[in-house]
Amino acid sequence: MTPSRARSCGFGDRDRRVIDPPPILQLQIDAPGLPREEISRKLRLPSYVVHCSIWSESGEEEMSGMPDDYTRQKRLMGSLVASPFVGLDEHGDEGCFFCFPDISCRTPGRYRLKFVLVVLDWPLRPNARSIIRAELLSDVFQTFSAKDFPGMLESTPLAKALKFQGCNIPTKKGNDRGGGGGGKTDDAGVGGSEDKSSDDEAVSPRSRKRPRNTKNL
């Protein structure tokens, strides 16, 4: 699941909004001959780490740095490294997920996020270098100024299912204004009102009829 919008948060740390929807990546092991039990074991390895960075709309230039007056700050704020969470998706299928619920962008513009999967070599040794196993570039998302921001979207079924199982990812009802600009955003610190639905209502991954085993990241 890749982001589509964000509200720029400027150069301070107050009243910031997270990129929406929060990126959620799923690790898939492409090994047709591997038994299901072995795949399940590999999904639970604690050594997986995913790092996030911000890139230009073309995906050819890293945009983490800021203009000369703000060289001590980075364009992205929040937790840029995610550890694995093993749980069931909204269809009841097991998966290994990496969630980035706390990322904000300081400046307006059109960007992409780049995610890098690294498998740490245990035990960690001084000056050891970990091998990059996979890279993924997100779709283009737009960061709006505060007055043009169209609002936050409702949390996806996947985010709700993972939260139901204990994943540290906030869910919200959303306050999307239908893509229009202007007006004030919600007063909540991350935008959108918190979803107060019962945990047993439409968020449990086992409460849904399982469709075809397809994956959309």
Locate each region found by the language model.
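Structured recognition/catalytic domains enriched at protein termini
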Residues: 1-112, 118-217
